[in-house]
A protein has these predicted regions:
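Charged phosphate-binding loop/patch that engages nucleotide di/tri-phosphates or the phosphate backbone
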Residues: 175-202
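A short, gly/pro- and small-residue-rich
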Residues: 169-175
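Alpha-helical scaffold segments in carbohydrate-active enzymes
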Residues: 46-49, 154, 193
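Generic structural signal for well-ordered, non-transmembrane alpha-helical segments
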Residues: 41, 108, 192-195
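Amphipathic alpha-helical segments within well-ordered protein domains
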Residues: 23, 44, 48, 98-103, ...
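Divalent metal-dependent catalytic cores for phosphoryl transfer on phosphate-bearing substrates
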Residues: 56-169
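Acidic/His-rich, divalent-metal-binding segments that scaffold phosphate/diphosphate chemistry
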Residues: 1-91
């Protein structure tokens, strides 16, 4: 199988089959299985739309589609009954848990997307300051693909009542603002860079 390189030239293993991986950890036909596939497809579609607008980067579209489908793979390990998940970890932990899963599966670059998509990414300083129940290390999106998927994810609410809806950029800004000023400023920079600028002051 072909090895993967992202925009920075990092090597990252072989190409995954996202549905096969999801089926390994989620019971087909369960609400959690349905949710993670629907949400992943919507984030992937939005991320690919963004990628087409930023051809100068240039992001890898196949990698974006795969990683977007798998970015929430760790939610089954969290206590999120509204998503059909009855694990022991708090929901915020699903990012680094997803990284562990995909690293074990042999997909380290896709694994980074899992860990780095919470909010606009978490810094070690804010993890320590806020006492967040995740490892104390920087979990920030670095590559264009990681940033695009993280940004695209912010347009889709978490939960059964509105999982098929897409937020406006104003609604996404209001949601991300709850994480703090740094997150909102980063989101706004991405909105400009990715040409999604309605409602954002340049």
């Amino acid at each position: 199988m072909n090895s993967i390189k992202d925009c920075t030239g990092r090597e990252g293993g072989t190409r995954p089959d996202p549905i096969a991986i999801i089926n390994k950890y989620y019971e087909p036909g369960s609400f959690a299985h349905d949710y993670i596939i629907r949400h992943g497809k919507m984030v992937a579609e939005k991320a690919l739309e963004i990628a087409e607008r930023v051809f100068w980067l240039p992001p890898g579209s196949m990698f974006i589609e795969e990683a977007a489908m798998l970015h929430d793979i760790g939610i089954f390990m969290t206590n999120a009954p509204h998503l059909g998940c009855t694990g022991d970890y708090p929901y915020i932990a699903h990012g680094y848990l997803g990284r562990q899963i995909l690293e074990d599966e042999g997909y380290p670059l896709h694994a980074y997307v899992c860990e780095r998509h919470v909010g606009v990414g978490l810094t070690a300083a804010e993890i320590k300051e806020k006492g967040l129940p995740v490892p104390c290390r920087d979990m920030l999106p670095i590559t264009p693909e990681e940033e695009i998927i993280c940004f695209a994810d912010k347009f889709f609410p978490v939960g059964p009542d509105n999982m098929l809806t897409m937020r406006s950029i104003e609604e996404a800004r209001a949601e991300i603002g709850g994480y703090g000023v740094r997150h909102l400023r980063k989101f706004d920079r991405w909105a400009i860079m990715f040409r999604e600028v309605s409602g954002v002051k340049e």
